[in-house]
C-alpha cells in the first residue's frame, strides 16, 4: 500500500540548476577566482553530487601546482557557504516555480492521505528557501520529513539520505515511491529499495535511466492511481 512520496529537490521539484550555476559563478568572483562554469561544463559537473564535492572535483582538473590546489581545496567550505548565501538570495528575488505537474501531484497526494518527504543532497537552507517561496499560503502541503546532504555521511548515489527519510517517516521502502531526475539520485533511491519515478531535465536528459520503474517527461503525466498501480506491480514482480 502506498503511504508516502519522497522527492528529490533540485531538478525534480523545481528546475533550479541554472540558478545554482549562476550562484557558483558569483561566489567564484567574490573570491577573485575568475572561474566560469558554462552551461556545458556545469552539465558535466552535475555528475558529481554535492556542491562542495563539485568544487573540489573541479579544482582537481585545474592545471595548477600541487601547493595551489591545496590552497584552493582549503577554500572550498567558504566558497560553498558564499554560494549558498547567493543562491538563497536569488531564490528570494526571483521565485523559481515548481516544475509542471508538481504542485498538482502534491495536492492530490495530500488529499489521498499520503505523506510527503524530501531527500536531497543540497543544504537545509536551500531546501527551506525553495519550499518557502513556492508553498506560501499552502500549509497543507507541508512535508512530513526532510533529509539533506548536510545531515548524512555519504551523498547520492549512496542511499544514506533516503534511508534517513524512511527512518523519519517510520515506513518501509515498500510503501513509498521516490522521484528523481538524475542517475546518482536514481541509484541512491534504488539502493534504498525504493520504486523510483524519473523526470529528467535538460541538464541530465542524456543519462541512462533504464533502471527506473517509470521514466516520464513531466509529472503532469502521472496521478495517484497510476502510482499505486506502479508500486503494486513492482513489488509483485520482485
Where are these regions (language model features)?
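Residues at secondary-structure transition points
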Residues: 70, 74, 78, 93-100, ...
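N-terminal helical cap/lid subdomain that shapes the substrate entry/recognition surface
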Residues: 1-9, 13-100, 107, 111-112
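Asp-based, Mg2+/Mn2+-dependent phosphohydrolase catalytic module
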Residues: 1-2, 107, 123-125, 129-238
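Structured helix-beta-strand junction loops
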Residues: 93, 112-113, 149, 211
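Residue-level signature of catalytic and energy-coupling elements of molecular machines
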Residues: 24, 83, 120, 158, ...
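Small-residue-rich anion-binding loops in enzyme active sites
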Residues: 112, 116-118, 124-125
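Conserved SAM-binding loop
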Residues: 13, 116-119, 178
Amino acid at each position: 500500500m502506498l503511504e508516502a512520496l519522497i522527492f528529490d529537490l533540485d531538478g525534480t521539484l523545481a528546475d533550479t540548476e541554472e540558478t545554482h550555476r549562476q550562484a557558483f559563478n558569483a561566489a567564484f568572483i567574490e573570491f577573485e577566482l575568475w572561474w566560469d562554469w558554462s552551461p556545458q561544463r556545469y552539465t558535466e559537473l552535475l555528475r558529481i553530487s554535492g556542491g562542495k564535492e563539485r568544487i573540489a572535483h573541479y579544482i582537481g582538473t585545474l592545471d595548477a601546482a600541487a601547493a595551489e590546489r591545496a590552497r584552493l581545496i582549503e577554500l572550498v567550505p567558504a566558497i560553498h557557504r558564499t554560494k549558498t548565501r547567493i543562491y538563497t538570495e536569488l531564490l528570494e528575488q526571483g521565485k523559481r516555480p515548481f516544475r509542471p505537474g508538481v504542485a498538482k501531484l502534491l495536492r492530490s497526494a495530500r488529499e489521498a492521505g499520503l505523506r510527503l518527504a524530501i531527500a536531497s543532497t543540497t543544504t537545509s537552507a536551500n531546501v527551506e528557501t525553495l519550499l518557502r517561496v513556492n508553498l506560501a499560503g499552502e500549509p497543507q502541503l507541508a512535508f512530513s520529513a526532510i533529509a539533506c546532504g548536510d545531515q548524512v555521511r555519504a551523498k547520492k548515489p549512496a542511499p544514506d539520505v533516503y534511508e534517513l527519510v524512511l527512518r523519519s517517516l517510520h515506513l518501509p521502502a515498500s510503501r513509498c515511491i521516490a522521484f528523481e531526475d538524475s542517475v546518482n539520485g536514481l541509484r541512491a533511491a534504488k539502493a534504498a529499495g525504493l520504486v523510483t519515478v524519473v523526470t529528467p531535465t535538460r541538464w541530465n536528459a542524456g543519462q541512462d535511466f533504464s533502471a527506473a520503474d517509470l521514466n516520464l517527461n513531466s509529472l503532469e503525466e502521472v496521478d495517484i492511481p497510476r502510482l499505486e498501480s506502479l508500486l503494486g506491480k513492482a513489488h509483485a514482480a520482485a
